[in-house]
């Protein structure tokens, strides 16, 4: 367990008060956590304010909390919401820092070795460091993470023991401080001052922590004693104030002291000799030569620099772990008594289960053909049972909890009442005979009322044919297929909300960001064809797409009623009955959600010279494209500053498209 420096309380800031069945959900969750219950489920219907309930629980139980989402986009949305709810506490973001990642791999059939290739997002790397350092410094920490949090990260003990602690009056020579900084992978650069670097000017050492992006620290010496420490703006050097204590955390999460490094190198050398003997005995001379050359180079780098590319593949030796022992992960940076909340648990727990096997098969190929030592197999994500061993207390959050969650606990807390009074939609089943003409009539009725329609099909061909037919019938319709990129998808949803078109056809309309209050009709074709999108959970999630409009209605087109359909219909009717009773008792009239239509900082197409005028980037000349790139760069920076990394990545991709034309 890591000792914390400060013991702060969570302070929730919100203009809202718990309403509907939020108060009882919050009370039950808190009572169960304080009573020591290990696992429970918050089964919250779409639009009932689950994130607000989670925030209330965190503020009341006052435990460091890890919130896990199943992708970066959802993690980013949750991070933004928790930042708003807890402005005075440490809300951190921990996802994969790769913008692009091609893992190291070998394809024996074509004798192709694919070297690891990646592009690291500096902003996300900073936030990862901010998360781990916050966990060592304070206890009022919420970390919102993707499943990246179950991947190997390096020893938290080594990380904590390597912290360079400075305060005015401390007796330490300037050169000793410089050596200490180099030992924790800081780089000296007196000209290009960036995160993870330091510079020296006489008796002044300026240090730019890995967890900061604007502020650095100026350490001033008087002889062999620190005279004072000041926080400064990294760019301008402007002094922001003096500090009494400064903790400099390592610039990398994989850090080892000199003594441990010598032991690790000796173990790597011994394993190399052992594996070379195995290859030679099997007559694999090419593999033996390859492994010897690669590993000896890495050993030399570790001895001289304390680091090498792919250092994580030696993490078992550097951490002092036994073969097969789980790696250290973000979870090990938390104290023992921490809380885990799994958002959209029916998706996220499946991901946690699947990570290990995919990683293992790729690495086994590298080991068998002499690209890596067998110990590289222990640089891996956690198995699900290893993840479970880290769990002290956990809350699974989902509108449709999976079988796994239901096996873990019988404690299910429902949150069905929406603060807006909105009801789950009415669901009806209609025969497939004449379904297209029937649906056309329903669409026209919605168009007259300025409402939108979602249609979900099972095949790409059906979606395309349906779209073509409705276009011929004069309907403004679009088809959203799986090849559409995030930015384009956001544009389509925005255009649907604005009324540029009225009907959206798709196969999977359960992706994030497809909550549209203007949608009053959801049509499910082939509802009786069992499968992932037509099982009970898939149907309930799809039905939920019509739950943000007071006129919400769902039509399932099917010739038989499957068990999945019946269970989904029954569950929706049960929730609707509870919601109606609550509204009647409290005199609430359901109101369609009023949600602002946010234009992605006006860059979802191309920046136009005149407002509301779209421009084809192919029609721009070289100078105009240059100006467009400048505007996009500025907007990308603005997005980063407000921590909207998904948007920043979208703008970056667009910028690359424009640059590619030159």
From Swiss-Prot:
Pfam families: Helicase_C, ResIII, UVR, UvrB, UvrB_inter. InterPro entries: Helicase/UvrB_N, Helicase_ATP-bd, Helicase_C-like, P-loop_NTPase, UVR_dom, UVR_dom_sf, UvrB, UvrB_inter. Residues 435-601 form the Helicase C-terminal domain. Residues 626-661 form the UVR domain. Forms a heterotetramer with UvrA during the search for lesions. Interacts with UvrC in an incision complex. The beta-hairpin motif is involved in DNA binding. This is UvrABC system protein B. It comes from Streptococcus pneumoniae serotype 19F (strain G54).
């Amino acid at each position: 367990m890591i000792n914390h420096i400060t013991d702060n309380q969570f302070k929730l800031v919100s203009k809202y008060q718990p309403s509907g069945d939020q108060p009882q959900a919050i009370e039950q969750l808190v009572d169960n956590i304080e009573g020591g219950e290990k696992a429970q489920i918050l089964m919250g219907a779409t639009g009932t304010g689950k994130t607000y309930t989670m925030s209330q629980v965190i503020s009341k139980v006052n435990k460091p909390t890890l919130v896990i989402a199943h992708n970066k986009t959802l993690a980013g949305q949750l991070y933004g919401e928790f930042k708003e709810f807890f402005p005075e506490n440490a809300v951190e973001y921990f996802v994969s820092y790769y913008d692009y990642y091609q893992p190291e791999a070998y394809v024996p059939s074509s004798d192709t070795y694919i070297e690891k290739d990646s592009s690291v997002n500096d902003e996300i790397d900073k936030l990862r460091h901010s998360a781990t350092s916050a966990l060592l410094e304070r206890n009022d920490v919420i970390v919102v993470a993707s499943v990246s949090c179950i991947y190997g990260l390096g020893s938290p003990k080594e990380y904590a023991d390597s912290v360079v602690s400075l305060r005015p009056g401390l007796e330490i020579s300037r050169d000793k401080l410089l050596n200490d900084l180099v030992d924790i992978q800081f780089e000296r650069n007196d000209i290009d001052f960036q995160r993870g670097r330091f510079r020296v000017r006489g008796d002044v050492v300026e240090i730019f922590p890995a967890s900061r992006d604007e502020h650095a620290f100026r350490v001033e010496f008087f002889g062999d004693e620190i005279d004072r420490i000041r926080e400064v703006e990294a760019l301008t050097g402007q002094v922001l104030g003096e500090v009494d204590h400064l903790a400099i955390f390592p610039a990398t999460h994989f850090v080892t002291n000199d003594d441990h490094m010598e032991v690790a190198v000796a173990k790597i050398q011994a394993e190399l000799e052992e594996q070379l003997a195995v290859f030679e005995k099997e007559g694999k001379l090419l593999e033996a030569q390859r492994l010897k050359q690669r590993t000896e180079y890495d050993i030399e780098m570790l001895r001289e620099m304390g680091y090498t590319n792919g250092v994580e593949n030696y993490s078992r030796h550097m951490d002092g772990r036994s073969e097969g022992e789980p790696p250290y992960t973000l979870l090990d940076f938390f104290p023992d008594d921490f809380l885990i909340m799994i958002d959209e648990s029916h998706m996220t727990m499946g991901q946690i289960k699947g990570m290990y096997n995919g990683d293992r098969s790729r690495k086994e190929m590298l080991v068998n053909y002499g690209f890596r030592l067998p110990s590289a197999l222990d640089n891996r994500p956690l198995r699900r049972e290893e993840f479970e061993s880290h769990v002290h207390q956990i809350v699974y959050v989902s509108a449709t909890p999976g079988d796994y969650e239901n096996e873990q606990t019988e404690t299910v807390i429902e949150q069905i009442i929406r603060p807006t009074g909105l009801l789950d939609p009415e669901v009806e089943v209609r025969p497939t005979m004449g379904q297209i003409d029937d649906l056309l009539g329903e669409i026209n009725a919605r168009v007259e009322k300025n409402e939108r329609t979602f249609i979900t099909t099972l095949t790409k061909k059906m979606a395309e044919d349906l779209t073509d037919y409705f276009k011929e019938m004069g309907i403004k319709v679009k088809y959203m297929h799986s090849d559409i990129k995030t930015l384009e998808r956001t544009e389509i949803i925005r255009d649907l909300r604005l009324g540029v078109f009225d009907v959206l056809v798709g196969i999977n309309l359960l992706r994030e960001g497809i909550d549209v209050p203007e949608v009053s009709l959801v049509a499910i074709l082939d509802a009786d064809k069992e499968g992932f999108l037509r099982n009970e959970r898939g149907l309930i999630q799809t039905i939920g797409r019509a739950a943000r409009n007071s006129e919400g209605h769902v039509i399932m087109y099917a010739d038989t009623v499957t068990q999945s359909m019946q269970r989904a219909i029954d569950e929706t009717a049960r929730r609707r009955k509870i919601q109606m009773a609550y509204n009647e008792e409290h005199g609430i009239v359901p109101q369609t959600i009023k949600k602002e239509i946010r234009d992605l900082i006006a860059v979802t197409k191309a920046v136009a010279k005149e407002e509301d005028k779209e421009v084809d980037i192919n029609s721009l000349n070289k100078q105009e494209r240059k100006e467009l790139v400048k505007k996009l760069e500025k907007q990308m920076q603005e997005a980063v500053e407000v921590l909207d990394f998904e948007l920043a990545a979208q703008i970056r991709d667009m910028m690359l498209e424009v640059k590619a034309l030159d």
